[in-house]
Amino acid sequence: MALVTVSRSPPASGHSTPVGPTDRVIRRRGRLQRRQSFAVLRGAVLGLQDGGEGNDAAEADPEPMEKPSGEEQPAEDQTDNGQGSQSPWKQVQKRHLHLMVELLRPQDDIRLAAQLEAARPPRLRYLLVVSTGEGLSEEETILLGVDFPDSSSHSCTLGLVLPLWSDTQVYLDGDGGFSVTSGGQSRIFKPVSIQTMWATLQVLHQACEVALGSGLVPGGSALAWATHYQEKLNSDQGCLNEWMAMSDLESFRPPNAEPGQASEQEQMEQAILAELWQVLDASDLDSVTSKEIRQALELRLGCPLQQYRDFIDNQMLLLMAQQDRASRIFPHLYLGSEWNAANLEELQRNRVSHILNMAREIDNFFPERFTYHNVRVWDEESAQLLPHWKETHRFIEDARAQGTRVLVHCKMGVSRSAATVLAYAMKQYGWGLEQALIHVQELRPIVRPNPGFLRQLQTYQGILTASRQSHVWEQKVGVVSPEEPLAPEVSTPLPPLPPEPGGSGEGMVMGQKGSQETPKEELGLRPRINLRGVMRSISLLEPSSEPESTTEAGDLPEVFSSDEEPLHPFSQLSRAKGGQRVCKGPWPALKSRQSVVALHSAALVASRARAFQGQGQGQGQEQRETGTSSTPRLRKVIRQASVDDSREEGKA
C-alpha cells in the first residue's frame, strides 16, 4: 500500500499575481490551499482524513504559491517500505488519481476511487465516491464515473453522475457486481477484484446510511451541487452507453465498432448485410429457401459463407420482421415494435428524430442518432403507466414542435406503446377512450392494451374530463393539477372490464401475445440481496458487549429486498389496513413489531397472574385445612401476581 498526498488549490481567478505578494495575500492563499491524503491499493484508492489547510507551510515557503492557482501541486508519495521505488500499477494509479482530482471542485473530496471492469479494453473506468463539505450540516455524496482511453492516457472524461438520495439501495448482482438504485435511476458496477469490491461496498454502505439519516429527497436544495458535474459530462457515446447499461435487457444494440478497428469478421458481416437486401428483393419469398439465399450471396461475394450461416438466418428473420412497417397514427407519430426501432433506414426515411421506448427489456439501439425517452415497465397488469403520461405527452409534443416525428414502440407495438399513444390522443385531441381506440385500431389492428392499462386509461379519461370542465384546479395556488401523475402505491384499481364485443380474430391473438411478452415475470424473480441487510448481518457476527443479552427474532436483519414477504411470525403486524406497509424502511417496522410483542407479553402475564392468584388463594385455603405447606408454589404465585398488585396500588 502506498500513501499519496495531493495539495489542492482554488481555481484560477483570471487575475495576475503581484510580483511581490504581501504576507496577507500569502496567508489568504495558504488558507485556501489544503491537502488530501490517499491510501493506494491495487484497483482502489481510499481517501484519508484531510491533512489540514497548510497555513504554516504557506507562510514558511511562499515560493510554491508562485505556481498558477487551480493546478494540482506535486504529490508526496511513500511506499510500505519507506523507499521511493514504486511498482508500475502504483505509478499508473497515482497519475490517474491526479487527473481525477482535477475534475473536482476545490471543496469536494474523493472518499473512494474504485477501478471497474471495462467492456472494451484498453479503456479504463473508475467509480468515484465524492462528498462535499461546503458548510453543510450533513454530508452529501454523489457517484461519478470517469473514463480513461487507456492506462497511459494523460486525460480523462466524466461519464456518470448519480446523487445518493435517502432511498438509495445497493444490491449484489453476483460475480462481483452490484447495482445502485437512487432517485429512480439504477446503475451497474463491477469492480476489478474482490478486495476492491469489499472496499467499495463499505464506503457505499456508510454513504447510504448518512443519506438515509439526513432525509435527502429530490426536488429540494439538497445535492444541488451535483448539477455542476452533470453539466460537465463529456465522455463519448460508447462510454455513456456502458454507464447506462442494464442487467435485465433482452434486446441489445449492436456493439459500436471503434473507428478504423473493424475486424475481418465484422467487415464480412457488413458486406453480407448489404447484399442480403438485394437478394431478398429479387427472390420469391414464398418458395426460396435459406440455403438458396446463402448460395446467391456466395456468388455475389465470391467466397464460401458456411461459417456465417447462423448470421445469415438471423439477419433474414430480422429483415422479414422489419417489413412490417411502423403504423402512422398521426402525421407526426408512428406506433411500432422493436423491429421498427432497430431499422435505421426506416427511421431516417420517416424523418423520425425522437424515439419513445416503453419497454423495460429493450435497449436504445441508436442513442447517438436520436433523442430517446425511456419508460421502463413490463407488459403486465400491475405496471403503472398513468404516472408517465404527462412526460410522454410533453416528449411527443417536443418532436411535433420541431417539425419532426416520433416513434413510440415497445416489444410488439400492441400493449404498452399502444396505451401511451391512446393517452396522447385523448389529451391532445379531447377524445374519449372509445373514440381514440377506434382511431388507433383502424390504423394498427393488432393494438390491444392489457386490462390493467385499459383501467388506467379509464381513470385518465376521468381526469381529463374533470380538467376540461373545471378550471378551479389551475386557479388555486399550490394545488396540484388533476393531470399530475398519481403515485402507484395509492392508485385504486378499478373493477375488471367486461370483454369487448366484436373485434377481429387477428387482433385478439396479437393482444394475447402482447400481454404475454414477459412470461418469466409470472414465475417470480429471485430475491435480490440488499447491501444494508448484509452489513447488518455482518455486525451481528461481532461479539456483544453484554453477554447476558440475546438476539430476538425480530432484531434479525432483512437480508433480501422488501419485494419478498418477511419470514417472521409477526410480519402481519407491520402492515396497515388494506395490506400496505406503514413504512418501507426496516428499522421502523422492527420497532413497531417489538412494541406490539411487548404489549402482548404484558397482557399475557397479567391474565396468567390473575389465574395463578385465584388458584393460589384456593390452594391456601386447602392447605390451612389440611395443615400442609407448599413454599415453592407460594413464591411462584407471589412473583407472577406482582403485576396485578402494582395495578391495585396505583388505583388506590
UniProtKB/Swiss-Prot annotation:
Q: Give me the ranges of the annotated region Disordered.
A: 1-31, 43-91, 484-526, 540-580, 610-652
Q: Where in the cell is it found?
A: Cytoplasm, Cytoskeleton; Nucleus
Q: Does the keyword Cytoplasm apply?
A: yes
In Gene Ontology terms, what is one molecular function of this protein?
A: phosphoprotein phosphatase activity
Q: Which residues form the DEK-C domain?
A: 266-321
Biased composition, class Low complexity, residue ranges = 540-552
Q: Which GO terms describe its biological process?
A: actin cytoskeleton organization; negative regulation of actin filament polymerization
Catalytic reactions on record? O-phospho-L-tyrosyl-[protein] + H2O = L-tyrosyl-[protein] + phosphate; O-phospho-L-seryl-[protein] + H2O = L-seryl-[protein] + phosphate; O-phospho-L-threonyl-[protein] + H2O = L-threonyl-[protein] + phosphate
Q: Where is the Tyrosine-protein phosphatase domain?
A: 325-466
Q: What is its EC number?
A: 3.1.3.16, 3.1.3.48
Stretches with biased composition (Basic and acidic residues): 642-652
Post-translational modification Phosphoserine, affected residues: S9, S37, S85, S87
Q: Which SUPFAM superfamilies match?
A: (Phosphotyrosine protein) phosphatases II (SSF52799), DEK C-terminal domain (SSF109715)
Could you tell me which PANTHER family the record lists for this protein?
PROTEIN PHOSPHATASE SLINGSHOT HOMOLOG 3, SLINGSHOT PROTEIN PHOSPHATASE HOMOLOG
Q: Which family does it belong to?
A: Belongs to the protein-tyrosine phosphatase family.
**Other facts noted in the record for this chain:** Tyrosine phosphatase activity has not been demonstrated for this protein to date.
Q: Share what the entry says about its subunit structure, partners included.
A: Does not bind to, or colocalize with, filamentous actin.
- The name under which this protein is listed is Protein phosphatase Slingshot homolog 3
Native organism? Rattus norvegicus (Rat)
